[in-house]
Amino acid sequence: MKAITLRQPAGLENLRLVDLPDPGQPGAGEIRVRVHASSLNFHDLGVVTGRMPSADGRIPMSDGAGVVEAVGEGVDEFAVGDAVVSRFFPSWLDGGPTIADFATVPGDGVDGYARDTVVRPAHWFTHAPRGYSHAEAATLTTAGLTAWRALVVDARLKAGDTVLVLGTGGVSIFALQFAKHMGATVIATSSSDEKLARAQALGADFTINYRRDTDWAAKVLDCTNGRGVDVVIEVGGPDTLGQSIQACRIGGHIALIGVLTGIAGQVPTVALMQRHQTLQGLIVGSRSHQRDMVRALDATGIKPVVDQTFALEDIADAFAHQAAGKHFGKLCLSI
């Protein structure tokens, strides 16, 4: 079996292409999956660069998509030949979150999907949307489901609402697409006019270059006639949260998803209180959420934006490209 392992000390130079024993046939309740694609997330980047400690020899990548090759006894949800996509929190099936760490997350606490074959419990997967390539399906595990949960489950977005998406990475572009299909107005930010033009082509109603307009919260208020947005997709963290609060309407919802500007910082609590806003942290979602999202994608025909696909053996180059921040949407691996 072809796989990538991460040797310690972590770093892109310590990602190794290796041959490992075949995982064998599935036992009761398990499926064997030929993995064809994965997609890169900043969580994965944190693991492979050592910002998030992992075991020596860990197989990285939390996202995986492929085809069922065999099913174990008692599995009736999947059949040989089904296209499937992995899940971020394998044990979170339904209901509210009960997990606050990454001990069970593939590519972090357990081995991930940078390999060509896995045998896993069937509930670690859902069906992939109809008509999706494996690379497109792989983008759903983390980025797609995070955007879905933020807008649909937590913020309860409805037609006529206004959404602010920060940046043009995987989660933000999914949020833009989901919000537009739900009848919302979308404001997108980026430091690149080229990326903003691409966001506009996807349906963004307003665009703001935050490098040129450093007081971008004021620009958001201009776009909303002083009201502010109903929902903010906040991926920046401490350096952007203050302006996100100012850009959000009184009683609005801020989905705290990313920490691109740092893992800790001051929270303007008085402004948050005065504006009666909900600040909700979240990390991905449950199996039930993912199945709901897949049904919605089947119904709407929304397709992810895959910026570039790298071969598995070029995984270090893929992460270097991600770290440079030049991509729009998702980066994927072909396995």
Regions found by a protein language model. Give the residues of each.
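Short N-terminal strand-loop motif that marks the start
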Residues: 1-65, 120, 320-323, 334
